[in-house]
């Protein structure tokens, strides 16, 4: 049986995540009281009507604070039943959350006459801290639209051909912010930039003219070899430590040329030695 626990601050995309999981065959429960998590796992195991026992639940700040504090204990009880439990935590920058609530005109569940929206968001962070600390996968939705979030959830949670650590190699541009859910970040902004070549500016690191240009640069080759050697040595250690998800982020200025080129090469090389390696270009 597989149980996915979805949590995160209000406005970060939990409802979208549940919709994606429901469309993928999961039995979904919104706003589950955290205290009944072990019983839910037990009941799902013995329910013979679940031909494909896949369950997803959301747990949010509307829970009793005492239950949220006990989340580590409750999760351990569920996992003791030999269930694959994945904790997905969604979040976004506070300014983005404020903007989303302003645009939708929805009420935050923790606001009241004496607590502003900004204060409610900060209180929510504290309440959900025990869940965030135990998240197997964190997705920062700050720069994601609805469709990108759906694709990200499918890529990270559902497209794992084999069990074991799921690795994501992701390119990004620093001008749009560094991905907060990255475990390892490599900055390649010191490399020659195709952007300053007029004939290459409109191409990306996926296009042959940019590939040929970067492949001919000695510094690019040195950087690639150093990053590759580091990852080939240490990523198997991450897998051996029972990490469920590892994100490797490669950043350049705009996320179109250098980081894309390096990410594509790294992805192909890592796929030769590791299982469950996926490649994503955040800013293309």
From Swiss-Prot:
Keywords: ATP-binding, GTP-binding, Nucleotide-binding. GTP binds at residues 60-63. ATP binds at residues 8-15. It comes from the Bacteria. Displays ATPase and GTPase activities. InterPro entries: P-loop_NTPase, RapZ-like, RapZ-like_N, RapZ_C. GO terms for molecular function: ATP binding; GTP binding. Belongs to the RapZ-like family. Coiled coil: none annotated. This is Nucleotide-binding protein in ptsO 5'region.
